[in-house]
Amino acid sequence: MTESAAPSPRCVAAILLAGGRGLRAGFGRPKQLEWLCGKPVLRWSLDVLAGYPGLSGGVLVANHDVMAATYPLPEGWMAADPGVERQQSVANALSALTDWPDDAVVLVHDAARPGVDSAVVDRLLAALDGADAAIPVLPVPDTLVEAADGAAGAVVARDRLARVQTPQAFRLGTLRRAHAEASGAAATDDAQLVRSLGVSVATVEGDARLHKLTYAADMAILAGLLGTKDMMRTAVGMGYDVHRLVEGKPLWIGGIEIAHSHGLEGHSDADVGLHALTDAILGALGDGDIGDHFPPSDPQWRGAASHHFLSFAGERVAANGGRIGHLDLTIIAEAPRIGPHRVAIRDRIAEILAIPAGRVSVKATTTERLGFTGRREGIAAQAVATIQLPET
């Protein structure tokens, strides 16, 4: 967790919870990083909250993968580690706000509700003029029944029920006390903990656009609610790398080790495939090349595994609000034969970048015994990366 930052005089902070695993959504990666109408789900909430005029700072609670894809954080924001449960994640964020006074206001919001806007925040802050806590709610439109063993029971009166959303607003001291006295109670939101103190929680009008992303089908619902079309441009980058073959070294190509009498010589593990892909992605971003970010003059990269370089390039795509559309890698070698390893290489590249294997193509060719590759002096690789980036 980063050190606490001193608050500004207005003392309004946000806690953005993005530490959930999202298993029910079934995306194969954190749902906060899924693409929604032109940018990752997490970015919808982060951009609105960080841009809110009355906000003095914030805490993003997220695991390493999500944090790396979101770097750099907005000015005034800090990072905190997630807990096993939501309640612990909020407690970790509160620890990052140690220097903030009890009369400060804190907004607690779930990143899985990307439709937050300034209007609902305005209503919440206004409600705190006469309360220690406020939450957005919507009426329940459906008929509700008790259900058990596959049978419908009595109808539940809905006129006294409401759907609770986030963000939720609290006086910081009240929320601190609620978490301190929670004693491990499992609460689904922070208002539940605050109510256990006997504190009245005000309600304000919610927003249908604060629909929660829980299942994969919710993506289509949110896309319709947010009413924004993808405004993306396609960028293409090319990469090329070559290394000399030397006897007695391990041979790494495309992130896997291949049994061979010779290996590639270089400052790192000399993986020509991953180096070419890294340069192709960085080229599409207009973000220099592998030597700019991992200079061979830097001893920390001596013997380094090249998957670190490719992973970095993928994180840079995400940090720029982009996504990898397709990668095409060609290995140029007389020996060893690459064909038997193509699937393993493809799958390893997809694993490193956390993208579907169908977005990766791996091919191999020779130079018909011509040139340095034909003489088995070295191996070359060339790559093309196609990525989508937000229009600027």
Swiss-Prot record:
Protein's pathway: Isoprenoid biosynthesis; isopentenyl diphosphate biosynthesis via DXP pathway; isopentenyl diphosphate from 1-deoxy-D-xylulose 5-phosphate: step 2/6; Isoprenoid biosynthesis; isopentenyl diphosphate biosynthesis via DXP pathway; isopentenyl diphosphate from 1-deoxy-D-xylulose 5-phosphate: step 4/6
Metal-binding is among the record's keywords: yes
Cofactor (UniProt): a divalent metal cation
GO molecular function: 2-C-methyl-D-erythritol 2,4-cyclodiphosphate synthase activity; 2-C-methyl-D-erythritol 4-phosphate cytidylyltransferase activity; metal ion binding
Source taxon at top rank: Bacteria
Any one GO BP annotation for this protein: terpenoid biosynthetic process
Residues binding a divalent metal cation, per UniProt: D241, H243, H275
Encoding gene per record: ispDF
Sites where the protein binds 4-CDP-2-C-methyl-D-erythritol 2-phosphate: D241, V242, H243, H267, S268, D289, I290, G291, T365, T366, T367, E368, F372, R375
Keyword field: Isoprene biosynthesis, Lyase, Metal-binding, Multifunctional enzyme, Nucleotidyltransferase, Transferase
Residues of the signal peptide: none
Family: In the N-terminal section; belongs to the IspD/TarI cytidylyltransferase family. IspD subfamily.
Annotated site residue numbers, Transition state stabilizer: R24, K31, H267, T366
EC number: 2.7.7.60, 4.6.1.12
Region (2-C-methyl-D-erythritol 4-phosphate cytidylyltransferase): 1-234, 1-235
Protein name: Bifunctional enzyme IspD/IspF
Catalysed reactions, semicolon-separated: 2-C-methyl-D-erythritol 4-phosphate + CTP + H(+) = 4-CDP-2-C-methyl-D-erythritol + diphosphate; 4-CDP-2-C-methyl-D-erythritol 2-phosphate = 2-C-methyl-D-erythritol 2,4-cyclic diphosphate + CMP
Task of the protein: Bifunctional enzyme that catalyzes the formation of 4-diphosphocytidyl-2-C-methyl-D-erythritol from CTP and 2-C-methyl-D-erythritol 4-phosphate (MEP) (IspD), and catalyzes the conversion of 4-diphosphocytidyl-2-C-methyl-D-erythritol 2-phosphate (CDP-ME2P) to 2-C-methyl-D-erythritol 2,4-cyclodiphosphate (ME-CPP) with a corresponding release of cytidine 5-monophosphate (CMP) (IspF).
Region (2-C-methyl-D-erythritol 2,4-cyclodiphosphate synthase): 235-392
Record carries keyword Lipid metabolism: no
Feature type site, description Positions MEP for the nucleophilic attack: R158, K212
